[in-house]
Design a protein with these regions (language model features):
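General alpha-helical segment detector with a strong preference for membrane-spanning helices
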Residues: 28, 68, 87, 133-135
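Active-site neighborhood of phospho(di)ester-bond hydrolases with catalytic His/Asp-centered motifs
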Residues: 21-23, 59-64, 79-84, 112-113, ...
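Active-site neighborhood of divalent metal-dependent phosphoester bond hydrolases
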Residues: 34-39, 48, 68-116, 120
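Short Lys/Arg-rich cationic patches that frequently serve as NLS/NoLS or arginine-rich RNA/DNA-binding motifs
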Residues: 2-7, 181-194
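A general structural motif
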Residues: 16, 56, 75-77, 121-122
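N-terminal active-site segment of His-dependent metallophosphoesterases
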Residues: 1-70, 162, 173-177
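Intrinsically disordered, low-complexity, compositionally biased regions/tails
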Residues: 32, 106, 167, 182, ...
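Conserved beta-sheet core of the metallophosphoesterase superfamily
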Residues: 90-177
């Protein structure tokens, strides 16, 4: 099912299946197993992701892929938003269908990035990078780090249906209502207009 409201250049995402998001797979990086003892091994993580995404789904990986031999095993249409560990973009372009080197604004309300973008109250920033469960950011950020989402990609379509953007609508309404009220107090004149 295609996602509604995406900018035209991203409208093909999820056309043939669901859209799923995860970050920080860190394939082949054994030190994470020490920090997160419940972390599945790399083959198991690939299996978990593939069971969700399937052959026809879209997988958005929000950086820090790790060993590309495991990334090659991932199914579906693969999109990478590069993370701080992702070096050598040419190799990624051979494996991923789309590669973005920095944050990507995919709609008027959704920003995808590896690291959380600070002061982004105008959008929902879906990111990864933050492994520590004790670190809380704010209601304008959603963390898809594999270690924070039980190593299972979120179903983006379902996430949207659950109303995760509803507070953005009220924030925008509050800003617009405030601007309208200030303009009314100026007698309908623009700022600086006499």
């Amino acid at each position: 099912m295609a996602l509604q409201g995406l900018y035209q250049c991203f409208s093909h995402w999820g056309k043939n299946g669901g859209t799923f998001i995860i970050g920080d797979t860190h394939f082949g990086e054994e030190d994470l197993k020490k920090a997160f003892p419940n972390r599945p091994n790399d083959d198991e993580l690939v299996k978990i992701i593939n069971q969700k995404v399937g052959k026809c789904g879209t997988l958005i990986l929000l950086g820090d892929v790790g060993d590309l031999e495991y990334a090659k095993k991932l199914k579906g249409y693969k999109i990478l938003v590069c993370g701080n560990h992702d070096k050598g973009h040419t190799a990624y372009r051979e494996i991923f269908d789309e590669v973005y080197e920095g944050p990507v604004l995919i709609s008027s309300r959704i920003l995808l990035s590896h690291e959380p973008v600070p002061h982004a109250e105008w959008v929902m920033n879906i990111h990864a990078h933050v492994h520590d469960a004790k670190v809380k950011i704010d209601k304008y950020h959603f963390n898809t780090c594999a270690d924070r989402i039980n190593y299972t990609p979120i179903n983006f379509n379902q996430w949207l249906k659950e109303g995760h953007l509803s507070h953005l609508i009220s924030t925008r309404k509050r800003v617009i209502d405030g601007a309208t009220e200030r303009k009314r107090k100026r007698g309908g004149k623009k700022i600086g207009e006499k």
